[in-house]
Amino acid sequence: MTAGVSRRALLIGGAFCVSTISRSIAATRVEIEQFDANGVSTGVAALDKIVKSDAEWRAQLSPRAYDVMRHEGTERAFAGPYWDDHADGLYRCLGCETALFDSKTKFDSGTGWPSFYAPASKHNVVETVDSSFGIRRTAVSCARCDAHLGHVFTDGPRPTGLRYCINGVALSFAPRGAKETAR
């Protein structure tokens, strides 16, 4: 009977380990909608999550971008890039170049931050509850590298009524039709 219990425990333990490893491997992949240089979707692909050490992020990002993207900081209003930019193209994550917002959804919110009424794809952003500073908000981050981008509010224009208030320092801009960078 002892051998039966041991075998059962071994099988259960082994199944648990396989299940845990499978979930862990799945958590390292994420579905990202990809866009060509003209902003046209080329489909959704399962891509590896971008995971870097703190030292690697510090080396890649400016101090201000590092604070915003890795520690949920906020740039000063009217001080960051893109708040008053009207060029046609895609706004991408500075950390991993994932397409986040299209200039076609950008609007002047008067807040001093780049504002959009919709992301380029719901696959490419993650929204989570942020209760810091004693207020309940919805934080927005990049789905591929977990970079903090900003917050989304329900005071935006039609057609969504949403305002994605994004830190410009967390973005890069690719003019529509520009040759894509590989990353």
Positions of predicted regions on the chain:
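N-terminal secretory signal peptides and thylakoid transit peptides that target proteins
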Residues: M1-C17
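Short charge-dense sequence patches
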Residues: R7-L11, V40-D48, C93-G95
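Compositionally biased, intrinsically disordered low-complexity segments
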Residues: R8, I21-S24, F35, T128, ...
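C-terminal segment of N-terminal export signals and the immediately downstream linker at the start
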Residues: I21-Q60
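A short Gly-Trp-Pro
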Residues: N38, K49-K52, R58-Q60, V68-R92, ...
